[in-house]
Structures are given as structure tokens and as C-alpha cells.
Curated annotation (Swiss-Prot):
Organism of origin: Trypanosoma brucei brucei
Family in the record: Belongs to the universal ribosomal protein uL15 family.
CC per GO annotation: cytoplasm; cytosolic large ribosomal subunit; nucleolus
UniProt region (Disordered), positions on chain: 20-39
HAMAP family: Ribosomal_uL15
Keyword Ribonucleoprotein part of the UniProt annotation: yes
Coiled coil: none
Superkingdom, natural source: Eukaryota
Gene Ontology molecular function: RNA binding; structural constituent of ribosome
One Pfam family it belongs to: Ribosomal_L27A
GO biological process, alphabetically ordered: translation
Protein name from the UniProt record: Large ribosomal subunit protein uL15
Length: 145
């Protein structure tokens, strides 16, 4: 049967509006937020949030990530990192190509072999012999952190 007013309009002035005496139907009967996730809300947490509770593994605070990482490359392999046209320009003495070893996945430059064309090398570590050979060929070394 259609009624003129909604239930809330009918209950205006009745003090409790269908929810019993003072204190009933109020506050947080099942706890706030994630309360009871391992108790009375267990089904919900197990179904929709598996793995929410409990620990897994160990925490290593202030871990230094791989301090021994030092992939090396020799002088004779440096030209492989250069484009062919860059090597030709360097031999003519036009523009020196810049080789960034860190961007290519290397951190240390070793002095085995000979440098075919002068270039500017950016590296984290460079051996004394490699530095000497690069400068002799007319290039330069830039150390990076």
C-alpha cells in the first residue's frame, strides 16, 4: 500500500525512531576499521585480503645493495660501445665521442689492449694504465659517483 510519508518522516518525534532505548544502534558494534580481522571478521579477511596478517621472511634495515658490483671492460672493447661513424669522426679529430660506461652496464675500465680512436670516457673506476693510454690517445677520463 502506498503511503504518504517515508518511514523516517513517520518516526520524527518518537525519540528512538525504531532503534530501541538510548545507546542501541549506535557507535561501532563490530569495531573500527580493520578491528577483528583475525576474530569476528575472519571470513572477510581470509577471502578478500589473504596474507594481510602475519610476517614473512626477515627485514634487513639499511641494507647496502651489492657493494661488490664492479663489472669491468677493457680498452680494446671500448670501440664496440661507440657507433662506427663516431669512431671515424674521432679519428679525423672532429668531435670526441662520449662513452658512458655506467649507462652501458660497466663500472670499471681496465687497460688491456689499445684504444683505436680518442674518446671521452665516463666511468666510476679507471685503472692507472687505462687512464694513461686514453690520455696518450688524445682522449679524457671523467670519474662519476
Amino acid at each position: 500500500m502506498p503511503t504518504r510519508f517515508k518511514k523516517t518522516r513517520h518516526q520524527r518525534g518518537s525519540t528512538f525512531c525504531g532503534y530501541g532505548r538510548v545507546g542501541k544502534h549506535r557507535k561501532h558494534p563490530s569495531g573500527r576499521g580493520n578491528a577483528g580481522g583475525e576474530h569476528h571478521h575472519r571470513i572477510n579477511f581470509r577471502k578478500y585480503h589473504p596474507g594481510y596478517f602475519g610476517k614473512c621472511g626477515m627485514n634487513h634495515y639499511h641494507k647496502k645493495k651489492n657493494t661488490t658490483w664492479k663489472p669491468t671492460i677493457n680498452l680494446d672493447n671500448l670501440t664496440k660501445l661507440m657507433a662506427k661513424d663516431e669512431a671515424m669522426k674521432a679519428k679525423k679529430g672532429e668531435v670526441l665521442p662520449v662513452i658512458d660506461l655506467l649507462a652501458n652496464g660497466y663500472s670499471k675500465l681496465l687497460g688491456n689492449g689499445h684504444l683505436q680512436a680518442p674518446c671521452i670516457v665516463k666511468a666510476r673506476w679507471v685503472s692507472k694504465l687505462a687512464d694513461k693510454k686514453i690520455r696518450k690517445a688524445g682522449g679524457a677520463v671523467v670519474l662519476q659517483a
